[in-house]
Amino acid sequence: MDFAAMTMKNRKDLSPQCGINPCSSEWTWLMMRLKSMSAKGFAGDFKNFDGQEPSELQDALCTVVNNWYNDGPVNAQIRKVLIGEAFDRYTIVHNGVIHIQQGLPSGFVLTVIFNSWVNECYKYLAWLDLAPSSRKALVHCDEDVDSITYGDDNGHAVKEDTLVWFNLRTIGMFLSKHGITYTDEHKNHWSIAKPSVDIQSISFLKRLFVPHPDMPTFFKAPLEKKSIEERLLWVTESKFASPDELLQENIKNSMQDAYQWGPVYFSELRDKIEDALAEVGKAHLMSEISYTGEEMKWFETVPGVVDYAQSKFAQDVFGVGVARA
């Protein structure tokens, strides 16, 4: 768990972005980091990531983890066994026993951490294959490429001279030789996807990078609208909350994500939800979330703003008595 905590704590300097809060100023920092490397790049994904993940990489990552801990051979062996049981395991299905030799189960606490690092390993392995002989050393990869990963999602800012031979298509072709299917973030096969795009146009974690309407140097993280609206259509049965309580929570979450799209979409979605609830006599379930309130919450994530936000910030920026957008 210490290794997982280290990975999350140092995400500003590492590729894995586990622990990031997209609905904060962290999203701005992430885009600024990528743009500091290059204005061009690409975002990728994988088809059946777990099913194509080489167990050798998982084992190699365990060695990296052990080297990081450096706490003796006994603890190292314990970790090897525990992680080995995760990616090379037996499971019972009805009256049969199945042997699974690759991929990590979704319930395993380190799955997203390890998958994020495997994602990074794929980049380095592709570099070793694709780079000209004078640039094979991985230090050159770090000089020319800055990457972000989260599970099987990835984004790469690549210097334009390097993009000629290190891009989404060339990486996809390399990975295909090893039985791994690479796609862009929209699930288009590598062979038909654009080799590179404007780095600001990529999506990551199904979220875009959109300049704030009033402060274009800051970036919002709008989630695709389909994901925002679909959660309003159903709830998952729970022993701890009623269907109405679950729906109310879904409405709250959808409105929080709608804020990222700006005031127009926020108001449109709010009106649709209010009308739908009124039709079935459940108007009381509507969230009290306002666009102004969400804007203030977002501003409070910007370093240096918190103290000011608690005093004159709302009055100076939004005016007095603004309750709804």
Where on the chain are the PLM-derived regions?
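Core catalytic machinery and nucleic-acid-binding channels of phosphodiester-processing enzymes
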Residues: 3, 7-64
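A generic structural motif
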Residues: 15-25, 71-84, 136-137, 179-194
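Conserved polymerase palm-domain catalytic core
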Residues: 37-150, 155-165, 201
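Short catalytic/ligand-binding loop motif for oxyanion handling, primarily in non-cytosolic enzymes
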Residues: 50-52, 213, 288
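Ordered core of a single globular domain
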Residues: 116, 120, 168-173, 258
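Polymerase palm active-site segment centered on the conserved acidic dipeptide of motif C
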Residues: 160-226
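Extended, charge-rich low-complexity interaction segments
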Residues: 214-250
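C-terminal, non-catalytic extensions of nucleic-acid polymerases
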Residues: 235-325
